[in-house]
Swiss-Prot record:
Keywords: ATP synthesis, Cell membrane, CF(0), Hydrogen ion transport, Ion transport, Membrane, Transmembrane, Transmembrane helix, Transport. F(1)F(0) ATP synthase produces ATP from ADP in the presence of a proton or sodium gradient. F-type ATPases consist of two structural domains, F(1) containing the extramembraneous catalytic core and F(0) containing the membrane proton channel, linked together by a central stalk and a peripheral stalk. During catalysis, ATP synthesis in the catalytic domain of F(1) is coupled via a rotary mechanism of the central stalk subunits to proton translocation. InterPro entries: ATP_synth_B-like_membr_sf, ATP_synth_b/b'su_bac/chlpt, ATP_synth_F0_bsu_bac, ATP_synthase_B_chain. It is a single-pass membrane protein. The keyword Transmembrane applies. This is ATP synthase subunit b.
Length: 163
């Protein structure tokens, strides 16, 4: 065997093998690699877009949360103001009502005091008349000072009628 022919045969076989691989095997492998690269690039682009959208959505969400907190704070402040106003109104109404009740009770007390004084004065006058009658009956004879006694009784009776 000739060494040159063997090397030439092997070289020719190798060239045919490389040509066959480049013609039929290599293109599908390259196509699969390129497709995979495109998919990876598209995935990376989609990932970047998704991250940007996520950042935008988080900013919007934070803004919405902040707005909600401000609205809640405003509503709470308004409710506290209304509560204060209602409490002040209730206090003033209660104070006015207590003043009315106090004045009404004071008038009732004054009326009762006046009635008691009037009754007491009447009883004092009645007792005075009774005492005077007893003293007069005991100390004065019937005929003596009759005119003075009648005058005293009439004047006391008039005082009693006035009361």
């Amino acid at each position: 065997m000739n060494l040159n022919a063997t090397i030439l045969g092997q070289a020719l076989s190798f060239i045919l093998f490389v040509w066959f691989c480049m013609k039929y095997i290599w293109p599908p492998i390259i196509f699969a690699i390129e497709t995979r690269q495109k998919n990876i690039e598209e995935s990376l682009i989609s990932l970047k877009k998704a991250e940007e959208e996520l950042i935008i959505i988080q900013k919007k969400m934070n803004q919405i949360i902040q707005d909600s907190k401000e609205k809640a704070s405003f509503i709470i402040n308004e409710a506290n103001k209304k509560k204060s106003i209602i409490l002040e109104d209730a206090k003033s109404i209660a104070l006015e009502e207590s003043k009315k009740i106090f004045l009404r009770n004071q008038l009732e007390i004054d009326l009762k005091v006046m009635q008691v004084r009037k009754n007491l004065h009447k009883e004092i006058v009645d007792l005075s008349i009774l005492i005077a009658e007893k003293i007069i009956k005991d100390n004065i004879q019937k005929d003596q000072y009759k005119y003075s006694i009648k005058k005293l009784i009439v004047s006391l009776s008039k005082d009693k009628k006035l009361i």
